[in-house]
Amino acid sequence: HSGSLRIVDLEYFGWDDPVKVASDFCWHPGMTLDEELLTSWIREMTEIFVRDKSFVGRLRAAHPLLGLRWAMIVLNPFLTRGCGNHVTDETLDMQLEKSRSLCRRVELLI
């Protein structure tokens, strides 16, 4: 043992479903892609996984659900408010608007 510090990031440990990867890229609140780029991303991912015959069907089923998941994730600051975490009203308002925006995008898909 050399005494050096080693960090293992278990957050990305294992395999992810390509459908989830494709969808999360579109839904992540940090992404500010226009509709043309999002469509291009999905088209390219579909081509990459063309041999996966269930990819498109799984994507159609999962994509709106994963959008709702992200709409809930951005609301996490509401869970920690009052638990010693100093979350401002401004932050909560911003997160609520992000969630509403994601829900509106999901609504357009269903």
For the regions a protein language model found, what residue spans apply to each?
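Glutamate identity and glutamate-enriched acidic tracts
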Residues: 11, 16, 35-36, 44-47, ...
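ATP/Mg2+ or Mg2+-diphosphate-binding catalytic cores
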Residues: 72-110
